[in-house]
């Protein structure tokens, strides 16, 4: 066939009418048809990815979510229930097809958890992420500063979420962000100051747009922003934000409020109704405002819950009962070297007693166990011994006063 008579096998255009005509074995295709085909493939691919994401995101009912949390988190029954409902409502909202006729807009159920260090706030977020198969970014609020100052700006949060999602934008936009130590960005004072609070109220203002839902330009691969750079547009509307913090001293704010409310009531009535051993259970949004969070942030974290302090019984259960309990992990580690690991009840109680005495929390249990077992994990793999039994005297010998003091300093 003469070159002048060549034509596109799809649209029939002659070669002179095209910018480019590509030949195959028995057919030809022009540049316009290639462009059109590319658009069709891209749209099909986008829809396929969306369907895949919805298929991957297995949404369970609130009771099923709580049951999953129960296998990893000991205690905190009320918080697990509140979290299960909030997470269920959030992802139920995402999976619901949008209709233009539907004028009821369901807002996000962002969450704030208040509780002492080591009570399980981060573990809750990690467990939810694992169950739903969605990416999770854990961010320390203490390193955040206002844009333009030394430190990480709030948009770096989304960079971390993209990294957790392997730079899949679709996955990232359905992910979870856990902001740890939210209390550390509380407003330092109600009084105006000449010195700018770049790591406090300024960061809170920066977080607002992320929490409420907006499109943010994020530098790819965590790079610095510069004018010629291509950005990734991330829509935060469907990202679930979970914030946590110890809020040291908020108990005094709660107690003061409760004492003011108790005026006019008899002391006996107040004693019957208030549990002074766990004041956090009475927390309300007003207390967060008094602590130093701005009202706008509080309004965008509508689900408020608390973590109960860990008593001796709960800490004991954390050591042995969860699916990934600390003692079970050490059993598995020793088993990899064909060593049978055993620990007496008295030794377990001693480790728990030290965690309570020095207020190390659940996180401190791991550090205490590591201090007790390290020498054995160093020596036994090179020896002929096939059993390692930890008794109370052995634990006492390994947990000297100096060792515990060091652990307390870093906890």
What is the meaning of each model-derived region?
Residues 2-33, 38-137, 141-150, 155-411:
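AAA+ P-loop NTPase nucleotide-binding core of proteostasis motors
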């Amino acid at each position: 066939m003469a070159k002048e008579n060549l034509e596109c096998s799809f649209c029939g255009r002659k070669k002179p009418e095209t910018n480019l005509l590509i030949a195959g074995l028995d057919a030809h295709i022009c540049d316009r048809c290639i462009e059109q085909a590319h658009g069709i493939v891209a749209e099909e691919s986008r829809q396929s990815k969306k369907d895949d994401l919805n298929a991957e995101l297995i949404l369970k009912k609130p009771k099923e979510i709580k049951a999953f949390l129960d296998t990893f988190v000991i205690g905190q029954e009320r918080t697990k229930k509140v979290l299960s409902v909030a997470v269920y409502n959030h992802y139920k909202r995402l999976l619901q097809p949008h209709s233009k006729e539907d004028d009821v807009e369901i807002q996000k159920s962002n969450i704030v958890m208040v509780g002492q260090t080591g009570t399980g706030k981060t573990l809750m977020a990690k467990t939810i992420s694992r169950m739903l198969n969605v990416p999770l970014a854990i961010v320390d609020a203490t390193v955040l500063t206002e844009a333009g100052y030394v430190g990480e700006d709030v948009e770096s949060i989304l960079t971390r979420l993209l990294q957790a999602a392997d730079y899949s934008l679709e996955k990232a936009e359905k992910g979870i962000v856990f902001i740890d130590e939210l209390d550390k960005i509380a407003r330092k004072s109600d009084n105006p100051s000449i010195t700018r609070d770049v790591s406090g109220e300024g960061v809170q203002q920066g977080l607002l747009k992320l929490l409420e839902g907006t499109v943010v330009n994020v530098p790819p691969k965590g790079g610095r922003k510069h004018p010629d750079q291509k950005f990734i547009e991330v829509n935060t509307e469907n990202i679930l934000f979970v914030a946590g913090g110890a809020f040291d001293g908020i108990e005094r704010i709660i107690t003061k409020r409760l004492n003011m409310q108790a005026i006019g009531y008899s002391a006996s009535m107040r004693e019957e109704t208030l549990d002074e051993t766990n004041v956090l259970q009475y927390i309300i949004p007003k207390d967060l405002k008094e602590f130093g969070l701005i009202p706008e942030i509080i309004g965008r974290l509508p689900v408020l819950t608390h973590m109960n302090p860990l008593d001796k019984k709960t800490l004991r259960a954390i050591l042995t009962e969860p699916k990934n309990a600390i003692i079970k992990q050490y059993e598995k580690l020793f088993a990899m070297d064909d060593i049978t690991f055993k620990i007496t009840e008295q030794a377990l109680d001693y480790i728990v007693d030290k965690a309570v005495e020095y207020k190390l929390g659940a996180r401190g249990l791991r550090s205490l166990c590591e201090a007790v077992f390290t020498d054995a994990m160093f020596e036994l793999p090179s020896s002929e011994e096939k059993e390692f039994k930890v008794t109370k005297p052995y634990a006492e010998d390994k947990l000297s006063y100096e060792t515990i003091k060091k652990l307390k300093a870093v906890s």
